[in-house]
Amino acid sequence: MLGGHNGAGARHGRVAALAVAAGMWLASGAAAAGEIYLRGGFGLDRPGDTAFMDEDCSSTAPAALYGCGTGGDGAPYRSAGGFGTVPAVGLGLGYAAGAARFEALVEYRPAFAFRGRTNFLAPGRQQSVSANLSSVSGMLAGFVDLGAPGLPELGRLAPFVGAGIGVVRTRIGKTTMTFPTTTTTVPGGTRTGLAWMATAGVAVALGERVTLDLAWRYTDLGAVRTKRGPGRVVWRDGSQEPRPLDLAPTRARLAGHGVRLSLRYVMGGF
């Protein structure tokens, strides 16, 4: 299942790359005079539901966390859940010429959480899962302003579309799995991989140099990955000694929709 997600992400990433290349081509063909601008803003993302599963469910040394069986809900062993609402802050440096803009964009998601349930036990029994995450992404993005003659006018609102592609480094902390009598801990991990986004929004000029952007954005940050490492099972009543585990990696996909509110400030032209 995860392989299919990754294949789709790669295809979408290639589409985003083509869109960025198109934006660069438009910029190169636009008027010679352009403007350098700085962007700062914040936003909220709502990643879609996902599931942590083994990279190799048949692994024995190290041991697969979930294994290849079927859980009490009839699905493969996994931890299914979501990341909730994710805050993001961003900073960009861009060049605008004519209808095209080209931008180097960095976004930081300082703190968000996975909350879900495993399916080892029958539905309704305690088997909750939690972990905290953060990510930093860097992308090259292209935008096209759509205020061309012949298109519908929206008053002071200037619509735009864009896409970007780059890299992301995502970190997940220790995962805690709570069962009726035991608690299992899984080591965290970091992963650097492909990231891409597509966006559409409107801009409002607040002055000669300042523009407010409000945009929808779809962002694909690829996979979140726990690393191979030591975990353990603890009996909360102390009836047994903690059991150490040598665990193989697991992963889940991190992608979803969000909104962005930002200000662009023109620093100068050339």
Which sequence ranges carry the predicted segments?
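Transmembrane beta-strand segments of Gram-negative outer membrane beta-barrel proteins
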Residues: 33-48, 159-161
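Transmembrane beta-barrel architecture of outer-membrane proteins
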Residues: 35, 84-90, 101, 135-139, ...
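Outer-membrane beta-barrel "beta-signal"
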Residues: 35-37, 253-270
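Residues on the lipid-exposed face of transmembrane beta-strands in outer-membrane beta-barrel proteins
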Residues: 40-42, 89-97, 106, 140-146, ...
